[in-house]
């Protein structure tokens, strides 16, 4: 079984951005993008933070496509990056006797933060279609005194259409180093037959992770209040949600059936993290689903679907 020989060559999209603190207290950027990735018009938030939306003009990836994102945040800079829409990973191509499932799509993120930098990476969710193969790699280097906030939400299959992952597979590699020490090192590989495992996805199609590497260790009472508030923020949301300490910072996990629930919870956590740092409260990003903004700020009453892991 082979694909037709007249296929278009795979995409090799990339973004490279450097953020620097200007004399007027705002964060300026330099860099560029290669199609199909595109930088949309940035704006400066009230606290001088550079807000940069990224657009994937091709609408999605197929097997063999690659996206590379490289970020550098200089000392004192503040930046927030998000995506305009969900990232779609379509069924693989390039099938052959050697690669019967086809070729993999690849997304790579590399970020380097200097001391005193503050970088927030909160893209919209990734949707892995049936039969798609996605390899995602994230390598983050955080200098002591810098703050990194990153979130990742992935849906395995278009469940609203009754679709599961099928012959597809999702692999994720995440490493975060703070100074000379590793804060997070994770390797994840999921395929359809593993999803029902109660010790894994428990039959749920959506997983999400939010990690905050704080610039300095939090006081015990401060951390306890942050975690307590984060657990209260689960109110009204479906799925299993857990939050715990990370040295220094926190890590939050979502497993459930709703990417919206994961996004709303992570936004509420984002507000609390900003408050702990004494920074301005974040606004609901302009490129996110606008109809969810009210739910994010005003939680509905708790439902029986909410599961608090810890």
From Swiss-Prot:
The keyword Secreted does not apply. Keywords: Chaperone, Cytoplasm, Nickel insertion. The keyword Kinase does not apply. Its main location: cytoplasm. One of its GO terms (cellular component) is cytoplasm. Pfam families: UreD (PF01774). It is found in: Cytoplasm. Belongs to the UreD family. This is Urease accessory protein UreD.
């Amino acid at each position: 079984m082979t694909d037709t020989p007249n296929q278009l060559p795979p995409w090799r999209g990339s973004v490279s951005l450097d953020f620097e603190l200007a004399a007027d207290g705002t964060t300026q950027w330099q860099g560029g993008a290669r199609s199909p990735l595109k930088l949309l018009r940035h704006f400066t938030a009230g606290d001088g933070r550079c807000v940069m939306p990224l657009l994937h003009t091709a609408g999605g990836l197929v097997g063999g496509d690659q996206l590379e994102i490289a970020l550098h945040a200089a000392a004192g800079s503040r930046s927030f990056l998000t995506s305009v829409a969900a990232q779609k990973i379509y069924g693989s191509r390039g099938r052959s006797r050697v690669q019967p499932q086809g070729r993999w799509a690849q997304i790579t993120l590399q970020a380097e933060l200097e001391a005193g930098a503050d970088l927030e990476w909160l893209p919209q969710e990734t949707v892995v279609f049936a039969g798609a193969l996605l390899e995602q790699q994230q390598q983050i280097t955080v200098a002591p005194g810098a703050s990194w906030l990153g979130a990742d939400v992935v849906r395995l299959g278009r469940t609203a259409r009754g679709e599961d992952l099928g012959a597809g597979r999702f692999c994720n590699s995440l490493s975060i180093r703070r100074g000379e020490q590793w804060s997070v090192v994770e390797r994840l590989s999921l395929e359809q037959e593993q999803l029902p495992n109660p010790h894994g996805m428990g039959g749920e199609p959506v997983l999400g992770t939010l990690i905050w590497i704080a610039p300095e260790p939090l006081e015990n009472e401060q951390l306890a209040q942050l975690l307590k508030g984060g657990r209260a923020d689960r109110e009204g949301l479906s799925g299993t949600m857990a939050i715990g300490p990370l040295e220094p910072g926190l890590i939050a996990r979502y497993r459930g059936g709703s990417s919206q629930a994961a996004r709303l919870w992570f936004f509420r956590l984002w507000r609390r993290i900003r408050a702990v740092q004494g920074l301005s409260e974040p606004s609901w990003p302009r490129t996110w689903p606008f109809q969810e903004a009210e739910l994010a700020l005003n939680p509905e009453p708790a439902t029986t679907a909410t599961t608090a892991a810890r």
